[in-house]
């Protein structure tokens, strides 16, 4: 399968999963990976509860991104809220989606948060969701022992199909 050339927007879950599995370098060398400041901040919380391999070095993270982490305006967050006031997103996902919707270029979003997936269906953007498994496979990187289920292509497809039914739309 040919690797896409769009910007890859990642949430905190993806950053932590890549760090935990030694896949961050493969991801950032294979794609133009970007995120928002709130997701970077979330990677820095809870250090005392994480194993060493899950502790993200902020300078290394920021330095490996294709662009500096984006700050998101209150206006962009408000525009997102108006489109889906009943879907609760964590701060990182909310900022990531607000940023994504403000972009004029082509992008895909990688993040297994269920509310985020539901939002993608609600907004008619589920084709922009991509699994970590797909991204890593496309750059030829395999994770020893495999990825946890929420990072797989099958899991993503199943969840999106469920939300299409719940939202009454078409995938």
Roles of regions detected by a PLM:
Residues 2-105, 114-171:
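Active-site-proximal, substrate-binding regions of enzyme catalytic domains
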Residues 109-110:
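Conserved SAM-binding loop
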């Amino acid at each position: 399968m040919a690797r896409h050339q769009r910007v890859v927007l990642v949430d905190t879950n993806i950053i932590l999963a890549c760090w935990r599995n030694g896949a961050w370098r493969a991801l950032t060398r294979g794609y133009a990976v970007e995120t928002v400041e709130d997701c970077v901040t979330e990677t820095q919380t809870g250090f005392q509860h994480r194993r060493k391999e899950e502790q993200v070095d902020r300078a290394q993270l920021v330095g490996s991104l294709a662009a500096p982490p984006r700050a998101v305006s209150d206006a962009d967050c408000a525009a997102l809220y108006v489109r889906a006031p009943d879907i609760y997103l964590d701060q990182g996902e909310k900022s990531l989606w607000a940023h994504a919707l403000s972009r004029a270029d082509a992008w895909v979003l990688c993040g297994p948060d269920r509310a985020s997936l539901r939002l993608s269906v609600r907004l008619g953007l589920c084709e922009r969701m991509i699994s970590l498994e797909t991204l890593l496979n496309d750059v030829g990187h395999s994770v020893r022992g495999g990825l946890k289920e929420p990072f797989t292509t099958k899991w993503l497809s199943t969840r999106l199909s469920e939300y299409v039914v719940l939202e009454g739309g078409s995938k």
